[in-house]
Every structure is written in C-alpha cells, then in structure tokens.
C-alpha cells in the first residue's frame, strides 16, 4: 500500500461566473483600459489566464464586446 492511498480529496465542481460577476468584470475592464493594458503587457502569465478564461466562458452572459480595443486586439 502506497502512502498516498490513505488520502481522499474531494473537490467541489467549479462555479460558473454569475451575471453580476461577469458584469462587474467587464465594467472594470471598460473603465480602466490603460491600467489593464499595462498589467497585461507586464504579466504575460495573467494574459494567458485571461485568454483561457475568455475562451472557456464565452457565452451570452459574458459581454466581452465592450472590452477595450487594445485588450481585444491582444486577446485575439
């Protein structure tokens, strides 16, 4: 018997971003484009995370069309 067999890990299923969550995110991105642009360029890992998030969450509830033009350009 291996030492790791005694561990039991139970993960809760991931929660989908609610409408309010998505609305808050897009509002922040739309209002503070210069700061977000600087963050994206200075932290490529966060840019990759945001790209992955947008790729998996594009649905009718996430209004990504209002993103700053520069962020939209970087993400596409």
Curated annotation (Swiss-Prot):
InterPro entries: Poxvirus_A2.5L
Residue pairs linked by disulfide bridges in the UniProt entry: 17-21
Domain of life (superkingdom): Viruses
Keyword Disulfide bond in record: yes
Record keyword Signal present: no
Mutation effect (residue 17 to S): Accumulation of reduced G4, L1, and F9
Induction or repression: Expressed in the late phase of the viral replicative cycle.
UniProt entry keywords in alphabetical sequence: Disulfide bond, Late protein, Redox-active center
Described function: Late protein which probably participates in disulfide bond formation by functioning as a thiol-disulfide transfer protein between membrane-associated OPG072 and OPG08. The complete pathway for formation of disulfide bonds in intracellular virion membrane proteins sequentially involves oxidation of OPG072, OPG128 and OPG08.
Subunit and interaction comment: Interacts with sulfhydryl oxidase OPG072; this interaction involves formation of a transient disulfide-bonded intermediate, allowing disulfide bond transfer. Interacts with OPG088; this interaction involves formation of a transient disulfide-bonded intermediate, allowing disulfide bond transfer.
Similarity remark: Belongs to the orthopoxvirus OPG128 family.
The protein, known as: Protein OPG128
Organism classification: Viruses, Varidnaviria, Bamfordvirae, Nucleocytoviricota, Pokkesviricetes
């Amino acid at each position: 018997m291996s030492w790791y067999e005694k561990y039991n890990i139970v993960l809760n299923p991931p929660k989908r971003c609610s409408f309010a969550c998505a609305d808050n995110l897009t509002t922040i991105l739309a209002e503070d484009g210069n700061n977000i642009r600087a963050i994206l360029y200075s932290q490529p890992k966060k840019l990759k995370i945001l790209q992955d998030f947008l790729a998996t969450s594009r649905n009718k509830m996430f209004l990504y069309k209002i993103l700053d033009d520069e962020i939209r350009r970087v993400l596409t």
